[in-house]
Amino acid sequence: MSELDQLRQEAEQLKNQIRDARKACADATLSQITNNIDPVGRIQMRTRRTLRGHLAKIYAMHWGTDSRLLVSASQDGKLIIWDSYTTNKVHAIPLRSSWVMTCAYAPSGNYVACGGLDNICSIYNLKTREGNVRVSRELAGHTGYLSCCRFLDDNQIVTSSGDTTCALWDIETGQQTTTFTGHTGDVMSLSLAPDTRLFVSGACDASAKLWDVREGMCRQTFTGHESDINAICFFPNGNAFATGSDDATCRLFDLRADQELMTYSHDNIICGITSVSFSKSGRLLLAGYDDFNCNVWDALKADRAGVLAGHDNRVSCLGVTDDGMAVATGSWDSFLKIWN
């Protein structure tokens, strides 16, 4: 028996040991524990606003921390900052590359970022002295498309890429300060923990990984999905996260239990998930699907509690405001809708 086979065998044994240890910890299921909790009942949300202005598919959106302004990115080559109260466009930013896949609003409200098939994360300053919006930095370093980006603060941003890595950037210097390697497929999405010390990433290797922002190391790896993970979102308390995948399921993983707690699926749902987001309390999980709908799940009981139907094409992105008062969905039909 060759050395390689021996190592393979050892690796399998270790994997089995880990699986057994996890099983030993799992003394009850989430379903059993939440059995005596009342269901949330039917959740009915109405479209309060429709944001019209993009001329092509919308690929990404992100709320500002004020829960009023949001940024959206479209195949029409524009980044639009919207006032969701009035539906006015605050800024319309022409992009150098129209192949944009992600956008992000800085917590301060001073900057937005975007990127896509140009492999570059472009940072735009919204608060210049002249009043015009301009590129303040172009972060080049990834060797694959930019799939997701999120600001830690005005000078730090985390990106995920089709080159299988994530990166932490110093915006001032334009340099990658940390590279997060470990995925074996395109990284599709990332989500920062509430304290911004950790983040999770979901990738086309069907795994999710938990990373330490400062140390640059992978803390935990979560498996269970049977296809690409397209979307990922932290639970509001930072102890768990949800994923959405092409296998037509969303799943809830717990950091402390080190395993999957719940699967959100239905026999009628056979299409992939593009985006996931929790309500402010974490009781509801909202997920956007390829079949033009957005399903609202009871996160504790895994029952479907409602549907947001109104788009005429794939729901590509969604987000819940920081104050928990509204949901925005963006679609390939070129419209954004605000619901509550």
Curated annotation (Swiss-Prot):
<dbReference type="InterPro" id="IPR001632">
    <property type="entry name" value="Gprotein_B"/>
</dbReference>
<keyword id="KW-0991">Intellectual disability</keyword>
<feature type="modified residue" description="Phosphoserine">
    <location>
        <position position="2"/>
    </location>
</feature>
<dbReference type="GO" id="GO:0060041">
    <property type="term" value="P:retina development in camera-type eye"/>
</dbReference>
<dbReference type="Pfam" id="PF25391">
    <property type="entry name" value="WD40_Gbeta"/>
</dbReference>
<dbReference type="GO" id="GO:0007186">
    <property type="term" value="P:G protein-coupled receptor signaling pathway"/>
</dbReference>
<keyword id="KW-0945">Host-virus interaction</keyword>
<feature type="repeat" description="WD 5">
    <location>
        <begin position="224"/>
        <end position="267"/>
    </location>
</feature>
<dbReference type="GO" id="GO:0070062">
    <property type="term" value="C:extracellular exosome"/>
</dbReference>
<dbReference type="InterPro" id="IPR015943">
    <property type="entry name" value="WD40/YVTN_repeat-like_dom_sf"/>
</dbReference>
<dbReference type="GO" id="GO:0005834">
    <property type="term" value="C:heterotrimeric G-protein complex"/>
</dbReference>
<dbReference type="InterPro" id="IPR016346">
    <property type="entry name" value="Guanine_nucleotide-bd_bsu"/>
</dbReference>
<keyword id="KW-0597">Phosphoprotein</keyword>
<dbReference type="GO" id="GO:0007191">
    <property type="term" value="P:adenylate cyclase-activating dopamine receptor signaling pathway"/>
</dbReference>
<dbReference type="InterPro" id="IPR001680">
    <property type="entry name" value="WD40_rpt"/>
</dbReference>
<protein>
    <recommendedName>
        <fullName>Guanine nucleotide-binding protein G(I)/G(S)/G(T) subunit beta-1</fullName>
    </recommendedName>
</protein>
<dbReference type="GO" id="GO:0045202">
    <property type="term" value="C:synapse"/>
</dbReference>
<feature type="repeat" description="WD 4">
    <location>
        <begin position="182"/>
        <end position="223"/>
    </location>
</feature>
<feature type="repeat" description="WD 1">
    <location>
        <begin position="46"/>
        <end position="94"/>
    </location>
</feature>
<dbReference type="InterPro" id="IPR036322">
    <property type="entry name" value="WD40_repeat_dom_sf"/>
</dbReference>
<comment type="similarity">
    <text>Belongs to the WD repeat G protein beta family.</text>
</comment>
<dbReference type="InterPro" id="IPR019775">
    <property type="entry name" value="WD40_repeat_CS"/>
</dbReference>
<keyword id="KW-0853">WD repeat</keyword>
<dbReference type="GO" id="GO:0005829">
    <property type="term" value="C:cytosol"/>
</dbReference>
<feature type="repeat" description="WD 3">
    <location>
        <begin position="141"/>
        <end position="181"/>
    </location>
</feature>
<dbReference type="GO" id="GO:1903561">
    <property type="term" value="C:extracellular vesicle"/>
</dbReference>
<feature type="repeat" description="WD 2">
    <location>
        <begin position="95"/>
        <end position="140"/>
    </location>
</feature>
<dbReference type="InterPro" id="IPR020472">
    <property type="entry name" value="G-protein_beta_WD-40_rep"/>
</dbReference>
<feature type="repeat" description="WD 7">
    <location>
        <begin position="310"/>
        <end position="340"/>
    </location>
</feature>
<dbReference type="GO" id="GO:0071380">
    <property type="term" value="P:cellular response to prostaglandin E stimulus"/>
</dbReference>
<dbReference type="GO" id="GO:0030159">
    <property type="term" value="F:signaling receptor complex adaptor activity"/>
</dbReference>
<keyword id="KW-0807">Transducer</keyword>
<dbReference type="GO" id="GO:0007200">
    <property type="term" value="P:phospholipase C-activating G protein-coupled receptor signaling pathway"/>
</dbReference>
<dbReference type="GO" id="GO:0051020">
    <property type="term" value="F:GTPase binding"/>
</dbReference>
<dbReference type="GO" id="GO:0007213">
    <property type="term" value="P:G protein-coupled acetylcholine receptor signaling pathway"/>
</dbReference>
<dbReference type="GO" id="GO:0008283">
    <property type="term" value="P:cell population proliferation"/>
</dbReference>
<comment type="subunit">
    <text>G proteins are composed of 3 units, alpha, beta and gamma. The heterodimer formed by GNB1 and GNG2 interacts with ARHGEF5. The heterodimer formed by GNB1 and GNG2 interacts with GRK2. Forms a complex with GNAO1 and GNG3. Interacts with ARHGEF18 and RASD2. Forms complexes with TAS2R14 and G-proteins; these complexes play a role in the perception of bitterness. Component of the TAS2R14-GNAI1 complex, consisting of TAS2R14, GNAI1, GNB1 and GNG2. Component of the TAS2R14-GNAT3 complex, consisting of TAS2R14, GNAT3, GNB1 and GNG2.</text>
</comment>
<keyword id="KW-0007">Acetylation</keyword>
<dbReference type="GO" id="GO:0005886">
    <property type="term" value="C:plasma membrane"/>
</dbReference>
<comment type="function">
    <text>Guanine nucleotide-binding proteins (G proteins) are involved as a modulator or transducer in various transmembrane signaling systems. The beta and gamma chains are required for the GTPase activity, for replacement of GDP by GTP, and for G protein-effector interaction.</text>
</comment>
<feature type="modified residue" description="Phosphohistidine">
    <location>
        <position position="266"/>
    </location>
</feature>
<dbReference type="GO" id="GO:0007165">
    <property type="term" value="P:signal transduction"/>
</dbReference>
